[in-house]
Amino acid sequence: MTDILKTTYSEEVFSSALELMPGGVSSPVRAFKSVGGQPIVFDRVKGPYAWDIDGNRYIDYIGSWGPAICGHAHPEVITALQEAIEKGTSFGAPCVLENKLAEMVIDAVPSVEMVRFVNSGTEACMAVLRLMRAFTGRDKVIKFDGCYHGHADMFLVKAGSGVATLGLPDSPGVPRTTTANTLTAPYNDLEAVKKLFSENPDAISGVILEPIVGNAGFITPEPGFLEGLRELTTENGSLLVFDEVMTGFRISYGGAQEKFGVTPDLTTLGKVIGGGLPVGAYGGKKEIMSMVAPSGPVYQAGTLSGNPLAMTAGIKTLELLKQEGTYEKLESTTSRLIEGIIQSAENNGIAINGGSVSAMFGFFLCEGPVRNFEEAKTNNSELFGKLHREMLKRGVYLAPSPFEAGFTSLAHSEEEIDRTLEAFDQSFSVIKN
């Protein structure tokens, strides 16, 4: 595999974008600040591939940050959307497609008895926090360092030594009063959670977390961690919330809660359930969800919620995922990929640790294990930046940050994995010196 990268047109377009949008992008990670180099401007995507506007083709392991689990522009999804768009792009009224997707989600996800569709994962997490507080009559919430729940003020909290229980805001413009009720703990640390419950008796509405961390790199729950959170929240009259925006329908059809056998009270979803279109959802027990307006007093609304195109793409995507052997294929593909990456790094004398669950994977360039965000920050970010640039030259598109999980799809075949591992071999050989 040889270097293919030429990005003249991307450079021109991105230079113009810098004058039009903050940082030249619509979401910060796309600016390549974590890895350096030239951001890629895409032209089209298909299957496991993405093409930039200079004509370069990449094997894509971002998948639009998770939604493209069937591969980009799956023909059955495209056909369904073409038929749906003839009926209109937005109704702003109930449609039968909402019922169908809701039934599919409820049938699949153990915790969900009722569901509300929104437009993004951030919206879902904002709404679920309001619902947690209303249902319990308590204001405080526990989140984990490195777990991302969208960009709403109450979740933008920096954890760590000395501020673990102070709820200090992690972005300018977020008042301390907004985050004062947000408590934080290290991921995989049950004792820290117990301490927070002990210090805040009858005050914590619930615990929210990514059951597999995907926004601090790829970090899995240690045995007993999720089970322990379930016990602690139940004992303290609090709710357990799984943010499955990333893991939902990706690591199994029923999400992380099915995979690990731990059922939360509420769940947030997104990405996969929209088949590549903007979507989010939150759901849970009927007694809790019945508090959401107009059934109850907890207000939440959205102009484009339940959008017929998003519902259509979501329905077709879930139909494809429900076919026999789907998750076995994803597991096999991703396991082979991450095992090959780790072996390649070790062959070149580069410290690495990583892993995968179904169609989700990640690695850190450091000694392991990595169990939380503090340990993740020992990753050699400079070396990762070099690796990212070398992989781009060889036609492989990884997340432009060491703190983002990677994704495979049903469209990734043995051929793509072979070519990817060849690119890793060459890239590790270059950067080791």
From Swiss-Prot:
Modified residues (N6-(pyridoxal phosphate)lysine): K271
Catalysed reactions, as listed in the record: (S)-4-amino-5-oxopentanoate = 5-aminolevulinate
Gene Ontology MF term list: glutamate-1-semialdehyde 2,1-aminomutase activity; pyridoxal phosphate binding; transaminase activity
Keyword Cytoplasm: yes
Enzymatic class: isomerase
Listed InterPro entries: 4pyrrol_synth_GluAld_NH2Trfase, Aminotrans_3, Aminotrans_3_PPA_site, PyrdxlP-dep_Trfase, PyrdxlP-dep_Trfase_major, PyrdxlP-dep_Trfase_small
Signal peptide annotation: none
EC number: 5.4.3.8
Required co-factors: pyridoxal 5'-phosphate
GO cellular component terms given for this protein: cytoplasm
Pathway: Porphyrin-containing compound metabolism; protoporphyrin-IX biosynthesis; 5-aminolevulinate from L-glutamyl-tRNA(Glu): step 2/2; Porphyrin-containing compound metabolism; chlorophyll biosynthesis
Keyword check for rRNA processing: no
Annotated compartments: Cytoplasm
GO biological process: chlorophyll biosynthetic process; protoporphyrinogen IX biosynthetic process
Keyword set, alphabetical order: Chlorophyll biosynthesis, Cytoplasm, Isomerase, Porphyrin biosynthesis, Pyridoxal phosphate
Subunit structure: Homodimer.
Family that this chain belongs to: Belongs to the class-III pyridoxal-phosphate-dependent aminotransferase family. HemL subfamily.
Name of the protein described by the UniProt record: Glutamate-1-semialdehyde 2,1-aminomutase
Organismal lineage: Bacteria, Bacillati, Cyanobacteriota, Cyanophyceae, Synechococcales
